[in-house]
Structures are given as structure tokens and as C-alpha cells.
Amino acid sequence: MENTSITIEFSSKFWPYFTLIHMITTIISLLIIISIMIAILNKLCEYNVFHNKTFELPRARVNT
């Protein structure tokens, strides 16, 4: 019966560290994936012909 109490005590001390490490690794991996996607999209925008014209609004001509 003493072995079960030792395993329960170990697991109760182990799980908060495990969840903390798991959260940190998931956040770091998501940041890495998002930065890679941003870099790929920037490279694709460099090869786009209409990249410089996307944010320009058409100007209306005023007839005088």
C-alpha cells in the first residue's frame, strides 16, 4: 500500500510541471509555425506582380 501513496504523491507533483512544459512547448511551436508562414507569405508577395498596387485606392476624376 505504500507504493500507491508514493506514486500518487509523485504524480501530483509531476502533473503541474508537465502541463507547464507542455503549454510552453505548444506556444513556442505555434510561434515558430506562424513565423514560417509569415516568411513564406512575404516571399510569395515579393514575386506577385500586383503587390505594389493592392493597397492603392482608385481615385475619382473630377470634371471641371
Curated annotation (Swiss-Prot):
Region Interaction with host BCAP31, residue ranges: 6-15
Residues in compartment: Intravirion: 1-20
Membrane topology (UniProt): Single-pass type II membrane protein
Protein's GO biological process: symbiont-mediated activation of host apoptosis; symbiont-mediated suppression of host apoptosis
PTM remark: Four species of SH have been detected in infected cell cytoplasm: a 7.5 kDa non-glycosylated form (SH0), a 13-15 kDa form that contains one or two N-linked carbohydrate side chains of the high-mannose type (SHg), a 21-30 kDa polylactosaminoglycan-modified form of the protein (SHp), and the isoform generated by alternative translational initiation. Of these different forms, SH0 is by far the most abundant protein detected during virus infection.
S-S bonds: none
Homology family: Belongs to the orthopneumovirus small hydrophobic protein family.
Quaternary state and interactors: Homopentamer forming a funnel-like pore. Interacts with glycoprotein G; this interaction occurs on the surface of virion particles and infected cells. Interacts with host BCAP31 (via C-terminus); this interaction is direct.
Protein name: Small hydrophobic protein
Organism: Human respiratory syncytial virus A (strain A2)
Phylogenetic classification of the source organism: Viruses, Riboviria, Orthornavirae, Negarnaviricota, Haploviricotina
